[in-house]
Amino acid sequence: MADITAALVKELRERTGAGMMDCKKALVESNGDIELAIENMRKSGAIKAAKKAGNVAADGVIKTKIEGNYGLILEVNCQTDFVAKDAGFQAFADKVLDAAFAGKITDVEVLKAQFEEERVALVAKIGENINIRRVASLEGEVLGSYLHGARIGVLIAATGADEELVKQIAMHVAASKPEFVKPEDVSAEVVEKEYQVQLDIAMQSGKPKEIAEKMVEGRMKKFTGEVSLTGQPFVIEPSKTVGQVLKEHNADVVNFIRFEVGEGIAKVENDFAAEVAAMSKQS
């Protein structure tokens, strides 16, 4: 067996743009023959996938699965809405979901490693970058989920609630985007940051500091209610808060997870002229 040196791996990386482990694997399989390694990587789609890896994957799907007292939520990204609806992409996302659920895997790096070969093959076939972005789970007495299309997904753990109520509250979370379960759950860091913002606004209006501070105290109570699930008006019955509805049913929400496709990812928007210019440079 040929000695696979660091210099050989480096050369293959420079010529293909593929990752170090992919290059090393290809060289081992080709017994150190770099030309054969490149040919094999082209056939497997590894080079094409490496070229697509720099493309921003900000579209995709959210998947959820619940059995008994265990639930899991997953986001898999692609680049366009068109590919997000592709049967092959959907099947890949479902397979990742099932594997994560069966193994109770919540470390996304473990999932990425497990499905890297399939991901690379799918990238080569579809022509877009694909990324297993994040995964999370909840356990609880009563679990519920809600999917708004395939772009927003919610997982909820509750106590004392029936399935219908949990589903309604999951729908509320999808629509209203609470950040915390209860007002008292709002972190001190978030409270302090908002307090300073509101105090600056009040002071800029010319109010004395003592009056400004009292004004801000009232605003902060409103703020913690607005960003917490139980403090928000219930979307199905806006005259009541979610907390009041839960109390009427002797129920409680323990935790929730809300995923929205692409949130926090900067999606690059190119105009037509820029796309033509980019294509001309590649040709």
Swiss-Prot record:
Swiss-Prot/TrEMBL keywords: Cytoplasm, Elongation factor, Protein biosynthesis
Keyword Glycosyltransferase: no
InterPro entries the UniProt entry points to: EF-Ts_dimer_sf, Transl_elong_EFTs/EF1B, Transl_elong_EFTs/EF1B_dimer, Transl_elong_Ts_CS, UBA-like_sf
Disulfide bridge map: none
An example molecular function term from Gene Ontology annotations: translation elongation factor activity
NCBIfam families reported in the protein's UniProt record: tsf
Family: Belongs to the EF-Ts family.
PANTHER family: ELONGATION FACTOR TS (PTHR11741), ELONGATION FACTOR TS, MITOCHONDRIAL (PTHR11741:SF0)
Listed name of the protein: Elongation factor Ts
Organism per entry: Serratia proteamaculans (strain 568)
